[in-house]
Each structure stands twice: as C-alpha cells, then as structure tokens.
Swiss-Prot record:
This is Serine/threonine-protein kinase PknK. Key microbial factor involved in regulation of early and late events in tuberculosis infection, and in host-pathogen interactions. Modulates host immunity during early infection. Slows mycobacterial growth during chronic infection in host and during a variety of stress conditions in vitro. Regulates the expression of a large subset of tRNA genes as a means to facilitate adaptation to changing growth environments. In vitro, directs the inhibition of transcription and translation processes in a phosphorylation-dependent manner. The modification Phosphothreonine is found at residues 179, 181. ATP binds at residues 32-40, 55. InterPro entries: AAA_16 (IPR041664), Kinase-like_dom_sf (IPR011009), P-loop_NTPase (IPR027417), Prot_kinase_dom (IPR000719), Protein_kinase_ATP_BS (IPR017441), Ser/Thr_kinase_PknK_prd (IPR016236). It is an enzyme of class 2 (transferase). Keywords: ATP-binding, Cell membrane, Cell wall, Cytoplasm, Kinase, Magnesium, Membrane, Metal-binding, Nucleotide-binding, Phosphoprotein, Secreted, Serine/threonine-protein kinase, Transferase, Virulence. The keyword Metal-binding applies. The gene is pknK.
Length: 1110
C-alpha cells in the first residue's frame, strides 16, 4: 500500500496555526497528519467536550484553490448525515485568514492503518465494508460529487468499527472547474486506468477505485502496488495494460473474486453502471455464500421506498477487523440513548431542584405509572449532569434483561458508550463464563470506577420490566456496594426489585413519585401553549390540568387533539379523573382522526418493540414503510428515534399499549400473522433473538426452534455460548429435547463453558432425538461422530481416558467430511489422553494433524493445543519449550479477551511453571485472575494448577488462610465432580502446608498399597497417595521416618525416568527429603548433588526450596 505523498514538500505551515486554533475555541491542539491542501490537527472542543479533527488549509492558496475548498465544503455539507460519509461539523476561517473544516475525530484511524497493523481482512468483512462504501459513493454521485481518491487511507473507522468515506479534498461538484490537463488528482495504485491515460474522472472511475480498495483489503496490498525502485510511469503502464492478479489463488470464493474483477475492469463500460450496482452485486454475493446481508444506505424521497431498506443492518454493527460477530445479546443502539422527544421539552425546575438536592446519593428513583414523564425527566436530568461534567450512561430495560448475564452485558455496554476505557474486557467474561462471572464483573466494575476517580451516572429506564430475581439481585449488589463515584437513576412503575429500605436507612436514596411528577397549572400551560403551540386561556389550561390529574401523557394527547381542530370545551366534557378513561378517550380521539391508511399502518407497525422502514413495509405489505414512519414522526404520533441511529423507531410505550389493544380487536389470527411476518423479517436480516421472540408470539414454537437449529453453529463458533443458551431457554422444553442438532449445539456450548454435567445431559437427549429423527444415514453418521467427540471431551474432563480413542476414531478417520471444529477438538482430546498415558512423544504429531482444522475454528483450538504442547514438554523436562508454549497460549487467549476462558486456562498452566521456576509474583497475578472467575469443570491438570499451585503461591506469600481456602474449594470441587486424582492432589498439598487431615483419610493414606501400572490416571493417583503417606510418616517418630524413607525409595525406583522425567525428578527429591529426615545426611548430600545440578540447569529452583533442600 505504498503511495507517493504529493504533499511531502509542503510541511512549512506557519507555526502559529495552533495558537490561532486556540483562539478559535479549540484546546489540546496536536498535529496528526498532512494531506489535501493542508495539515490535520486533533483538538478538543471544550463547549461540547469532544475530540475533533480540524483540517487547516496551507498558506499558498490562490483564489481558485480557495474557491475549490469552499466548493468542497458545500459538497460535504450536502452529504453529511450519511452513515458512511464523515460528517462536516463546522467550517470557518482562522484569524490569519486560513480556512478550516471541523470533522469528528476517528481514534480508530483508517482502513489503511487497520490493514497495515493486522493484515488482510476476512472476505466477509470486506464485502460488508464494500456494500457500505458503495452506498456512500452512490449518495455522493447522486448530488453530482465525484470523490476522485477512494483508497484505504481515506476510509476512516468510527468508534463502532463502521467505515466512513472522507477527504473530499480532491473532490468537486461535477462541472465546477477542470483540473489542469495532465495532472492526476488521486493515488496511482487506486486510480482507474482511463484517468491515468488522461481522461476526466467519472462515477465509473470511482467504482474502479472502490474495487481496488476492496482488493487491498482482501490481500493486504494494492493490486498494482508500486515496486521497489519502480518509476511512477512504469507503475502507470502496468495499471493500464495488465490484468489484476487472480484472487481465486488466495482461496477466496469465485464470486467474490469475480465481483472485484468487474469493479476493476480495464474499460469503464465493463464495470457496474453505478456504485449502487456494485453494492447490490456484493449483497448478492453475501446472500449466495450464506453470510449476513448488509444494507446499503441510500437517500430516498418521501413516499418512495427503494428496493432494499437502509436500516436492516444498522443495529447489527461490529468491529472494523475480523469476522463480523453477533452482538451479545443483540441490541439496537436505541437501548443506550433516551428517545428523541417529538416536541420541545418543558423545563420542570421544581423537580430538577429535588434531584439536585439528592447530591451524590447512590440511587435516584423516579417511579410512577405509565405516561407520567419519568423518562423525559430522567433525560433532562441527564443533560444537566452532563453539563456539570459527569459521564451519564443510559440503559433502557427490555424483556431480555430478565436474564442476569444479558442485563450485565447491557449495563457494561451503556457505560462503555460514555467511558470507552472502562470495563473493556468484562463483557467477554460474561459471554464465556455466564452466571458464574456476575459477582466478579460487578466487583471489578465498582473497583474500576472508583480507581478512575471520575463521576459516572447510569440512567436505568423502565426497571419495572425486570422480574428476574437474579437480575434484581445484581442491581441490588451494585447499589449496596457501589461508591459515590457511581450514581444510578432508575425510572420504574414502583419501588419493586430495589433495596429501597436499606438505601433509605443509609441516606442513599432520593425519590420522586407520581404525586411530584403531576403537572401543575404553570407546567401544563408551558406544555400546551409554549411547547404545543396552542393559545388556551388560563381557565382551560387549569381545567385540563384538573381533569387529567396532571398526567403528562393525557396532556400531550389533549394538545395533539386540539392542534387537529378539536374543541377544548367538548374535550373537557368527555374527560374524567380516571387514568384508564383518559387514556382510552384521548388515544381514540387521536387515532380515529387519522386517515384509514395511516391508522392501519400504525396498528401493524406497533407489533414489534422497534421498527424500521423495511420491517414496517413487511408488516404492512407496502413498499414505502420508511416514508410512512417519517410521516407519523412528523405529525407527532408518539413515534421516536435516536440521533445516532435514525433508521430505527420506537412508539411511546403508552401509545404502543393502546395500539396493541386496538389491534387485538381484529382477532388473534391477525396478530399471529403479523408476528410471523416480523419473525421472518428479523430472521432474514440476522436478528435471531427477535426472530425467535416473534415466532413464539405467533404461537409457532416449531418455527422458533427451527430458527435456532438453523443457526446452531454460528453462536458457539463465535464463542457466544451464553447467548445461545439464553435463547434456547425461551423455547418449549418438549420441542428442544426432540431436536438432535439443537441438543448437539447445547452440548457444544456447555462444553465450551466448562460445564460437563449439562453437556452430558444434552448428549443423552441428542441420542434419543436422533433415534426418532428421519434424517439420511450419512447425516446421522456425521452427527454421531460429532457427538462422540464431545463425549470424549466429557470423558477427559471426568479424568477417564479408556474410551477416548474409540470415541474419536470415527472423526479422526474422515476429518475432511466433518465441520473443522470436530477434528480440531478431536486432536486436542487425543493429545490430552496421550499425556494421561505418559505417551508424551505422541502428543506432537496428534496436534500437528489437528492444526489445519484448528486454524479454521478460531483462536480457542490453538490455545488448547499450545497448552497441551506445553504440558507434554513440561513432563519431559523441556522447560524452555514449555514456557514458550504456555506464553504463546496465554498471548493468543488474552487477544480473545483478557478474562476469556482460554486466557485463564493458559494463565493457570503458565503460572504453575512460573512458580516452579521461581517467579512468585508473576505466578500470583495469573493465579488470582484465574481463581476469581470460578469454573465448573475442566481437565484435572488445569484444576490442580488452579487450586493446588494457587494455594502454594498463597502460602509462599504468607497468606496461609488464603491457601487453606483455595484447597478447601478445590476439595469440594473434587467431591462434586468425582475426581479422585484431584482429591489426591488436594490432600497431598494440605500435608505439605501442615493442614491436618481427617483421621480416617490419614489412615487410608498410610495403608500399604500397590501402584497400578496399566492405567496412567490410576498410576498418578496412587503415586500421589503414596507421596502423602511418605510425608505423614516423615512427621512421625524414628520408626515412622525409616518407613517413610523405604517407601519413598521404592516409589522413586518404580518410576521410569526416561519415560516420565518430571515425575522421576519429583520422586527423587521426595526420597532426599526422607533421607535428611532420618539423619542420613551423607546419603542425602550424595543424592542431592546431581539433582540440584539438574534443577539449576532447568531453572526449576522452587522444587528444592519447597522441599527444604535449598
């Protein structure tokens, strides 16, 4: 991606520009780049507390170039608002006469930077970017603007990973003026051949540049990148004469390569006719390849709906690199921002005074029935807090928040939207560890907020929708344990689900109820006359206030009716003080005055909690759904949308409830059909959880199950196990248990979450379901092979390996006929079984065989494989290799998520070896992080490292109580999971640390035993028990110590040092300990000398320290 910098010699801008920017109202001025006609600075606008990029023109602008700049800004102004074109925030002239333009600052930099740092993009991500940029170019072309320099460096990435086209510094309104003959305004590697040959740029040349940009994203370099030492003219000749390199050789789908080739065709006539055509072709490629189909936002005229709506993908955003992921849980941006009011707000000073008096109390509770203006007041208070410098997050509660994990995920996301650096990795913890991580996440969040020393408030709107006790307990924990840096502002119908009593006793509660929320006459006058545009006499205002009991919703509906020509006197005669009567009367006075087409549209559009043009069109069976929504919004019909996501709409809850009641008059069959349409639209556009919800609401649970089953591999393979299990919980149990594929997906999710018992249950149900399913024999064989691999994983988790090879045989005999996750997991499982049989040399070829499949699984298979390599190397005393393997595994796991299960697994094993090599501090940090998250299962070697070595580290640090707690928890885990080898390790460590064992346990350990040699796990368990017996005897009288010495010698002699080097070394050290304990100092020194040398050579210093020999 090498390009000539045409401005390399223009770095002489007058140095007082930063001073002029400060004078213009900008702070923290920092130069970040040069291009176009000047320099780009990163600044802060104090008035809005936001970072911006300011582009300042250079000093040598002549009149024509100045006119060009101003024309550029007019073009940009006409394009502002498109989601994939950078918005122009301000244009002005500095004190020295230099024009400047202000745009949002993009901290994530450009697509070029992303590619340079992380390499080529996945083809699915590239298609997604291509569709969006095609929409941006089409929008520009429709207003007569050519970009002229589309390339990765001119595509910036928003904080949400969305691409935005920028730098129209060489763009101009078509026909405005011509660039001097022979001057190429653009980057050669991305410029169309005809432009290089002297032709004027056209929309077709922008299409070529878009294709060249996508080629670069797919390969990591330009199609005609300038070679080392190559002259520019030679590069031009290659671009104009040679075909582009064949992308099929990169392993890309043929239709992906063909689409790029057509966009980069040598002759303009052979390219797609418009940028929109490019976008539609890329969408067709997405559809054929079974990936999520992106929408291509284009400007539309009122009443005209284009072929595909622009909003279907708006809530399905993802990061700028890698494969797109389904959000967890999938949520619209509207959830994290108060809805934009349909009219002006009324200032309610008496209520904000109450809130202000609440100071920094942990909870501000605003509670009243629907329609009292709770959310509006919270939004106003949010604005006031923001002006005072607080960071204020917003979270609107919906039914999905009745799942504790999803609620916490939403809470973290809302906070990250106002403080992106807070809780960066905690969301991933929730996804992988589910319910177990709740307390850890909340504690970590409280600590981070406190340590950040920054005031944060979170508005939690509509809390009454939560009935789940675990979710309520989570919020209660946050309120009980939070600090005064964090304040929660909760709106709800009541006080239910909140620890109001405790907070009131501690003076941590400020409260506003329905009595306070009711409008008084002055406030009602402001609402009806000032904001509502009416001219009601004071007497009528007072009468309306009295008859509505100051209910904000009723007053708003009354204003709407009166603006439509209603008579105030007649309106007042029809009102009573009962809220239900007011609600029904005023709602019908609004709805029944509408034309039938609009009334019918509002009824059907209310079926879903949120809607957009495409969805509303599908529900109503029309093509202009977006125009109808905009018309309803324009007429103030209680339809709201947010500033940052204008494509999605939501009805005011009270009005939506009324519409639902009216809709139900048409019969349940009609409502069910609308839910079916909604389910179909959501499923087609990639919103699984909403598709499932509406299928269930339609009374079609079979379709809901089908939807999840069809999507069964996507969520687990993206490590969205908790999301999958939460969605499955919504489905009828009787239907879930009868679906073989779905049970297999549930088993995968539970295995990946380290939950062997639920996984085994799912596998058992799988067999029953498969026996009843009418599937082709080949399909059944594939599913059984996959299930057997999962059973093998469950076996090794249970510390049994006898059946593992048989269970893996089918999958390992035909790996290429199965999904990559199956042979990839099989290879890891076979390797772990080999370790348990002391066949360490066999581990490496097994993992080499599995590696190609693990690369297609994502990072998790690679993390496990590196851990297994490290375990084999450690047992062979190849300490250098083991450390490298564990470090690699930890680095890859941490890249997935700092608190991911993969990182913690690798971290525990790395910590064990760090401890043995003397790095107590490093081992302690890793062990503490692993221990806090908890785990329901896993291989015994991982659990032993976590509990046993974790306890040993605590003891070495002087925390004997912490060590005992670790061992106690480990002992409970061993009993619960039925793991004798783990129990033996726990008992052995208790003896080492001087923790007394129950008499019966000690007696069993002291009894003579024969160590089996035909089963590796039984061998290790018996050896641990014999080690424990030796240590117990060593603490006794002289006769016992002599017996200990004899048994230790026999134990060491029985271990084959060539086959099991580490075990042999550990047994030798134990024998030396007993020799010293019996007073045989000379013998002990003689045996210690070679052992000490070996430990020093290997760096295993801690082995001798723990034995008291160093």
């Amino acid at each position: 991606m090498t390009d000539v910098d045409p401005h390399a010699t223009r770095r002489d801008l007058v140095p007082n520009i930063p001073a002029e920017l400060l004078e213009a109202g900008f702070d923290n001025v920092e130069e970040i780049g040069r291009g176009g006609f000047g320099v780009v600075y990163r600044c802060v606008q104090p008035s809005l507390d936001r970072a911006v990029a300011v582009k300042v023109l250079s000093t040598d602008l002549d009149r024509d170039n100045l006119e060009r700049f101003l024309r550029e800004q007019r073009a940009m102004g006409r394009l502002s608002g498109h989601p994939h074109i950078v918005t122009v925030l301000q244009v002005g002239v500095l004190a020295g006469g230099r024009p400047f333009i202000v745009m949002p600052y993009h901290a994530k930099n450009s697509l070029e930077t992303l590619i340079r740092r992380h390499g080529p993009l996945d083809w699915r991500e590239t298609l997604s970017i291509g569709v969006k940029l095609a929409g941006a170019l089409e929008a520009a072309h429709r207003v007569g603007t050519l970009h002229r320099d589309v390339k990765p460096g001119n595509i910036l990435l928003t904080d949400y990973g969305e691409p935005q086209l920028t730098d129209f510094g060489i763009a101009r309104i078509a026909g405005g003026f011509e660039t001097a003959t022979g001057v190429i305004a653009g980057s050669p590697a991305f410029t169309a051949p005809e432009v290089l040959e002297g032709a004027s740029p056209t929309p077709a040349s922008d299409v070529y540049s878009l294709g060249a940009t996508l080629f670069c994203a797919l390969t990591g370099h330009a199609a005609y990148e300038r070679r080392s030492g190559e002259r520019v003219i030679a590069q031009f000749l290659r671009i104009t004469s040679q075909p582009i390199p064949d992308l099929r050789k990169q392993g890309l789908p043929a239709d992906v390569a063909a689409a790029i080739e057509r966009a980069m065709a040598r002759h303009p006539a052979d390219r797609p006719a418009t940028a929109a055509d490019v976008g539609e072709e890329l969408r067709d490629v997405q559809r054929r390849n079974g990936v999520s189909v992106d929408e291509m936002p284009l400007p539309v005229e009122l009443g005209v709906e284009r072929r595909r709506s622009p909003e279907a993908h708006a809530a399905h955003r993802h990061t700028g690199g890698g494969t797109p992921t389904v959000p967890t849980p999938p949520t619209p941006a509207t959830k994290y921002r108060p809805s934009v009011p349909t009219g002006s707000l009324v200032t309610r000073s008496r209520l904000t005074d109450i809130l202000r008096a609440g100071g920094r109390r942990r909870l501000i509770l605003i509670h009243a029935p629907s329609g009292f203006g709770k959310s509006t007041l919270a939004a106003q208070w949010r604005e006031e807090l923001s002006r005072d410098g607080a960071a204020v997050a917003w979270l609107t509660i919906d039914n999905d928040d009745n799942n504790e994990v999803w609620f916490l995920s939403h809470l973290l996301e809302s906070i990250r939207r106002v403080r992106p650096t807070l809780a960066e990795s905690l969301g991933h913890v929730l996804e992988e560890h589910g319910d177990d991580a709740g307390r850890y996440v909340l504690t970590s969040l409280i600590d981070e907020i406190h340590e950040n020393d920054d005031r944060i408030a979170v508005v939690i709107d509509d809390w009454h929708r939560v009935s789940d006790s675990r979710t309520q307990a989570a919020l209660g924990f946050l309120l009980d344990n939070g600090c005064h840096h964090l304040q929660l502002i909760v709106t709800s119908w009541s006080r239910a689900g909140l620890p109001v009593g405790r907070l009131r006793i501690g003076d941590e509660l400020a409260e506003i109820d329905s009595a306070a929320l009711r409008f008084d006459t002055d406030e009602a006058a402001a609402l009806l006359n000032d904001a509502g545009g009416l001219r009601l006499p004071r007497a009528d205002v007072q009468a309306l206030t009295t008859s509505t009991d100051g209910w904000a919703a009723a007053l708003r509906l009354a204003a709407l009716s009166l603006r439509g020509g209603g008579d105030a006197t007649q309106l007042l005669r029809g009102l009573s003080g009962a809220s239900d009567v007011i609600h029904e009367f005023l709602s019908e006075n609004v709805l029944d005055t509408l034309e039938p087409e609009l009334r019918e549209f509002l009824l059907v559009a209310s079926v879903t909690e949120r809607t957009c043009g495409g969805l509303a069109s599908a529900l109503a069976g029309i093509t202009n759904g977006r125009a109808m929504l905009e018309e309803a919004e324009h007429r103030g019909l209680f339809l709201q949308r947010t500033e940052d996501d204008p494509n999605w709409f939501r009805f005011h809850q009270m009005f939506a409830d009324f519409l639902h009641r009216r809709l139900e008059r048409g019969g349940s069959h009609r409502v069910a059909e609308l839910h079916r349409r909604a389910s179909a639209w959501f499923a087609e556009n990639g919103y699984l959880h909403e598709a499932v919800d509406h299928a269930l609401a339609a009374g079609d649970p079979a379709r809901a199950v089908d939807l999840v089953e069809q999507d069964e591999t996507n969520l687990p393979e993206q490590s969205k196990m908790t999301t999958l299990l939460a969605i499955v919980q919504k489905l009828p149990t009787s239907m879930v248990v009868s679906r073989a594929r779905l049970q297999l997906a549930i088993a995968w999710a539970n295995i990946l979450l380290q939950r062997p018992a639920p996984a085994t249950g799912a596998l058992n149900r799988f067999e029953t379901a498969l026996g009843r399913a009418e599937l082709p024999e080949a399909t059944q064989a594939d599913l059984r092979a996959e299930a057997d691999v999962l059973r093998a994983v469950a076996e090794v988790f249970a510390d049994r390996v006898e059946r593992v090879d048989d269970l893996l045989a089918e999958a390992m005999s035909r790996p290429d006929t199965l999904p990559p996750r199956v042979p990839g997991t099989a290879g890891n499982t076979a390797a772990l079984a080999a370790i348990c049989r002391f066949e360490f040399a066999e581990v490496y070829p097994l993992l080499d065989w599995a590696a190609p499949y693990q690369e297609m699984m994502g990072p998790f298979g690679t993390v496990y494989a590196q851990c297994l390599r490290g375990m084999a190397a450690r047992n062979r005393l190849d300490i250098v290799a083991a450390l490298q393997n564990f470090r690699t595994a930890f680095e890859v796991g941490t890249a997935v998520g700092a608190h991911s299960h993969a990182a913690r697994l690798a971290g525990s094993l790395l910590a064990e070896l760090l401890y043995e090599t003397g790095d107590l501090a490093g081992a302690g940090r890793l062990m503490d992080e692993s221990y806090l998250l908890g785990s329901e299962g896993g291989a015994v070697d991982y659990l032993a490292a976590r509990y046993v070595i974790g306890a040993r580290v605590k003891a070495a640090q002087g925390d004997h109580e912490g060590a005992a707690d670790r061992l106690s928890t480990g002992g409970d885990t061993a009993v619960q999971l039925g793991l004798p080898r783990l129990a033996a390790r726990i008992n052995n460590e208790r003896i080492r640390l001087g923790i007394a064992l129950p008499a019966a346990v000690a007696a069993d350990l002291l009894a003579p035993r024969t160590i089996p040699r035909d089963n590796g796990i039984a061998t290790m368990t018996a050896e641990l028990d014999e080690d424990s017996a030796v240590r117990l005897l060593s603490a006794g009288d002289s006769a016992d110590r002599d017996q200990a010495c004899q048994r230790a010698g026999a134990l060491a002699a029985a271990i084959d040092g060539t086959r099991r080097p580490l075990a042999a070394l550990q047994a030798q050290i134990l024998h030396i300990e007993t020799l010293a304990a019996t007073g045989r100092e000379s013998d002990a020194r003689n045996e210690l000398a070679p052992v000490a040398t070996k430990c020093a050579e290997l760096g295993l210093s801690r082995l001798l320290v723990d034995a008291g020999l160093a």
